[in-house]
Regions:
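Conserved catalytic motifs of ABC-family nucleotide-binding domains
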Residues: 6-24, 60, 119-120
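A short, proline-enriched helix->beta-strand linker immediately N-terminal to the Walker B motif
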Residues: 75-79
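ABC ATPase nucleotide-binding domain "signature" region
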Residues: 61-62, 68-73, 97, 112
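Conserved catalytic loops of ABC-family nucleotide-binding domains
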Residues: 102-114, 120
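C-terminal portion of ABC ATPase nucleotide-binding domains
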Residues: 44-48, 100, 121-168
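Catalytic Walker B motif of ABC-type/P-loop ATPase nucleotide-binding domains
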Residues: 81-84
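ABC-fold ATPase nucleotide-binding domain signature/coupling loops
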Residues: 2, 39-68, 86, 90-93, ...
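ABC ATPase nucleotide-binding domain helical subdomain, centered on the C-loop/LSGGQ "ABC signature"
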Residues: 14-55, 99-100, 107, 167
Length: 168
């Protein structure tokens, strides 16, 4: 599970990522980092995977922490991954890259809990909750055509924006 606010420990980036898979070699770690777009900032750090993290990852931004936690989850080789608003601190362009990379993990079931419609638009199924209960289940296209709650959320989030969530 990857949460909106995850835990990072004092130690190196490598040590933190190996909590996901203690046997992972650097090649495997970098592959997970690329999928989570963590390579984008790690490659600019002088010590890369050996960069020391403060307790809680306080020397990283919120988005950087989230990307490391996504990479750590990917290293676990789980059959089911739960992403609970795990890209909320990531800009939309980076989130789009992460979504595209996660699509390559075809044998992994991904449950995405999100507030941004762009996070779920291209998923197989979207479950709309209302007052803690399942309101409707469908694809983006089905819900946009038939569900007033989804239509309202979509309209409010897409107003003024041009991110259609597509995987160009």
């Amino acid at each position: 599970i990857t949460l909106q606010k995850n835990v990072l420990f004092s130690g190196t980036v490598r040590e933190n990522l190996k909590w996901g898979n203690s046997l992972a070699d650097d090649e495997t770690i970098w592959k997970a980092c690329r999928a989570a777009c963590a390579d984008e900032f790690l490659s600019r750090m002088p010590d890369g995977l050996d960069t020391m993290l403060e307790q809680g990852g306080n020397n990283l931004s919120g988005g950087q922490k989230q990307r490391l936690c996504i990479a750590r989850a990917l290293l676990g080789n789980a059959k089911i991954l739960i992403f609970d608003d795990s890209t909320s601190a990531v800009d939309t362009a980076t989130e789009k890259k992460i979504r595209k990379a996660l699509a390559d993990y075809k044998d992994v079931t991904k449950i995405i809990i999100a507030q941004r419609i762009t996070s779920v638009m291209n998923t197989d199924q979207i479950v709309i909750l209302d007052d803690g209960k399942i309101h409707r289940v469908g694809t983006h296209k089905e819900l946009l055509a038939n569900d007033p709650i989804y239509q309202e959320i979509y309209a409010s989030q897409m107003k003024g924006g041009n991110d259609n969530g597509s995987e160009e």
